[in-house]
Each structure stands twice: as C-alpha cells, then as structure tokens.
C-alpha cells in the first residue's frame, strides 16, 4: 500500500465541503494503492451521519442522533452510506494496530488523540508511508508522511 486515507479526507469525497474539490482531484490522480482501516470506516460512517443529520434536521449531539435513528432508521443517510461503501470497496482494508504500547507511545510522544495514534501505528505496522488527511495534527508526524493535497 502506498497511501492511507483518513476520515477527514474520505468525508469530502462523499459530502460536499470546502475541501471536496481538492480531495476528489487528488483521489482521482493518486498513484498506487490506497488503504484504510475499519476504525476509519466507523469514524467516517459516524461523522457522515452527524453532518447529514445536522444539515437536514438540525440534530446536534449523539443522543439526539441516536434517538432519530431509533425512530426513523438510517433512511436519511442511504445515499451517503452507499457512497461510503463504494469508496471503501475500492480500498485495501488493513487491520487496525492492536499494539497497545505503540499506540500509547505515539499518542504521548506526538500529543495525538487516541484514534489518530491508532492510525499512525496502523500505517507503521503495514509499512504505509503516506497519509491523505486534512487533519493538521498529522503534520508533526514523519512516518507516515502527510501528503500535500
């Protein structure tokens, strides 16, 4: 694998944001094999639901989102889910790191949130040298290298 895709990169491929044009252009011209993990899928799924629920229904907060899903189901996000699954079907899905000491060390050393540290550890374990992300927290990491989008 040549490039790991982060949630902050995947979401604008599917939902129109201020970074959509850049993300789509980069993705359509990216050489090599792209990868992601199931933790990124879960995060992108959740973030997409939150964005759509807020835009369409003014729903903010996880509790209200959960309540809406219990009452109405996921119908409001069918197109997003279909598109998310389509993006992921074109990626190599790598297993998330389970090296707890590595994840903790990366989080502490680079002041990263746990999920970002998990992504870094996952990239390192799978020898994925680059990450496509709009998350600036990854700019302080040298392995994987944050690519310019």
Please give the residue ranges for each predicted region:
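Active-site neighborhoods of divalent-metal-dependent phosphate/nucleic-acid chemistry enzymes
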Residues: 82-129
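Short, well-structured N-terminal submotif of metal-dependent ribonuclease cores
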Residues: 1-40, 46-61
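Alpha-helix capping/helix-boundary segments
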Residues: 10, 40, 118-119, 137-138
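Histidine- and aromatic-rich ligand-binding microenvironments
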Residues: 5-6, 12, 36, 96, ...
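Active-site-proximal, substrate-binding regions of enzyme catalytic domains
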Residues: 11, 41, 45-100
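Acidic, PIN/NYN-like endoribonuclease modules and their adjacent C-terminal/linker elements
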Residues: 2, 120-149
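Structured helix-beta-strand junction loops
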Residues: 29-33, 90, 141
């Amino acid at each position: 694998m040549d490039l790991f895709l982060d949630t902050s990169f995947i979401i604008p491929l599917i939902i129109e944001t201020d970074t959509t044009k850049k993300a789509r252009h980069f993705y359509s011209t990216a050489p090599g094999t792209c990868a992601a993990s199931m933790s990124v899928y879960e995060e992108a799924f959740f973030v997409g639901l939150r964005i759509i629920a807020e835009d369409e229904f003014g729903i903010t907060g996880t509790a209200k989102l959960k309540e809406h899903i219990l009452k109405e189901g996921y119908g409001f996000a069918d197109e997003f889910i279909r598109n998310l699954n389509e993006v992921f079907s074109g990626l190599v899905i790598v297993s998330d790191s389970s090296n707890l000491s590595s994840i903790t060390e990366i989080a502490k050393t680079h002041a990263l949130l746990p999920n970002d540290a998990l992504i870094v550890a996952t990239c390192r374990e799978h020898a994925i040298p680059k990450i496509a992300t709009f998350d600036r927290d990854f700019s302080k990491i040298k392995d994987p290298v944050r690519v310019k989008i």
